[in-house]
Amino acid sequence: MMRARVPLLLLGILFLASLSASFATSLREEEESQDNPFYFNSDNSWNTLFKNQYGHIRVLQRFDQQSKRLQNLEDYRLVEFRSKPETLLLPQQADAELLLVVRSGSAILVLVKPDDRREYFFLTSDNPIFSDHQKIPAGTIFYLVNPDPKEDLRIIQLAMPVNNPQIHEFFLSSTEAQQSYLQEFSKHILEASFNSKFEEINRVLFEEEGQQEGVIVNIDSEQIKELSKHAKSSSRKSLSKQDNTIGNEFGNLTERTDNSLNVLISSIEMEEGALFVPHYYSKAIVILVVNEGEAHVELVGPKGNKETLEYESYRAELSKDDVFVIPAAYPVAIKATSNVNFTGFGINANNNNRNLLAGKTDNVISSIGRALDGKDVLGLTFSGSGDEVMKLINKQSGSYFVDAHHHQQEQQKGRKGAFVY
């Protein structure tokens, strides 16, 4: 009897051991994923909504599902659209305000209005200062064309859902990938609405024989020419005078604020070895998307998801299609490990300020000065005297983007510093 129990006991021990190991592995993976709640790796953070031989649509996972620290972004989503040359994204509407930024290629965007009205926009990434962008009001039917015969089109969209944090796209077309939303209406509703027999409605709108392979389809070059005429003749006025551009031989930053959406759009280009010096935004929560290249980023914030007087550095190695979130008031520095460019969206952009912590100009530390009855506030703030602090600051003759080729990065542990209320 005892002999029979021994194998069972061993099996039980082995089962518990494997269960414990599995739990430990799961816990470790969860802890690792929480090590940097601001970093979204392109390999596992994008969810594909549609894909065929002509392109794809994919959406980044919800920000607030990654970390409670990002719960203020629960009403914002990132969407990426890519399409091959001479293709059309079929007409649709979404339950979200959309802000489109063209990152490569060119596009013809058509907004459909009531009473047979349409607005045409020709958008391109060729603008040397800033890629074209366009706002699409929620519920507006629109379609997109890639008119270029050779170059792929890539668009990044900031979506602001109006119903709930999920985005719902409503396509009129019935394709192999999905049904037209009109098909969900009952037979008698459709017949009364179109004043036609259901058989005719089904043949004209929904019949499988005429269906496309998906929501991204090939388009005839003659149709593209006709659309291009409308788009170029109706092209909107340049907004370049509203741009705020700063740059030097190491990098360029261009920003533009859409006051109606309270959103900042930014474009950052950096040469390999360049450093965007430590800085922070006063109000805006910035969502950075890597378009091309690689970079090392360091963000300083409170340690852990709690009120604390300790802070730590959240570091990440960024590459193409990665996303990084920079909360308001969190200092950040970016070093280009190759030529790199980003698209940024800043939430809460109205009355936002960018504050630099190093460099010759716009440096808030050097602005502290002497304000307490003539006393040296800088000297009280740091271990050195105010003169020593200013001497240190003035050693850097560059601003915003500086050369970091010859400076090695040092690892630092978290220490007490920022006050969190």
Curated annotation (Swiss-Prot):
Matches recorded under SUPFAM superfamilies: RmlC-like cupins
Keywords per UniProt: Glycoprotein, Seed storage protein, Signal, Storage protein, Vacuole
Signal peptide bounds: 1-24
Subcellular location: Vacuole, Aleurone grain; Vacuole
GO MF terms held by the record: nutrient reservoir activity
Pfam families: Cupin_1 (PF00190)
Glycan attachment points: 252, 341
GO cellular component terms, A-Z: aleurone grain; vacuole
Ranges for domain Cupin type-1: 237-390
Similarity comment: Belongs to the 7S seed storage protein family.
Function: Major seed storage protein.
Protein's recorded name: Phaseolin, beta-type
Species annotation: Phaseolus vulgaris
